[in-house]
Amino acid sequence: EILKEKGKYSTIRKIFAPIWIKGPIEKFVDGKTVIVGDAAGQAKPTTAGGIFTSGMGGVFAGQAISKFLKTNEISHLQEYQKRWTERFGKEFDKQLLARKILERLDNQTINKLFESITPEITNEISEKDDFDFHTSSIIKLLGIKGSLKTAQTLISGEFKKILG
């Protein structure tokens, strides 16, 4: 009925909401309530993307719910958060740290960081690294020499804030 009235490709209603990027919430499971995806803080802190991390959250939650329904043992629901945290917890911790650092930088400092990236490094990361695990790419991107140059850039940016 609605589609006939509105037309085949009409927008019925648009909904907008912010995406939580401060990391996973404390409890994915509360009693028999299971929280997944953006609501559970499974969007990546660096990019706010979360198709893979939230999707895997859905898979882990579904498996835990299935076990719970077969056994009626509520402890099976807790396996969901345990599995998700084992898979993504350390990466999210690193991404949260990266985000905290990057949020403090001014545009000029960020531009200098990007200018230090060589085409060779970009190609290596594009060919070999995992899009959903950014911190390994960042470490590879900077390398030892890059880390020194990056530290100088970050420090000079912070000094400018203090002095100016």
Task: List where the protein language model places each region.
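C-terminal helical "tail/cap" subdomain of flavin- and related membrane-associated enzymes
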Residues: 66-164
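FAD/FMN-dependent oxidoreductases across multiple families
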Residues: 1-61, 65-70
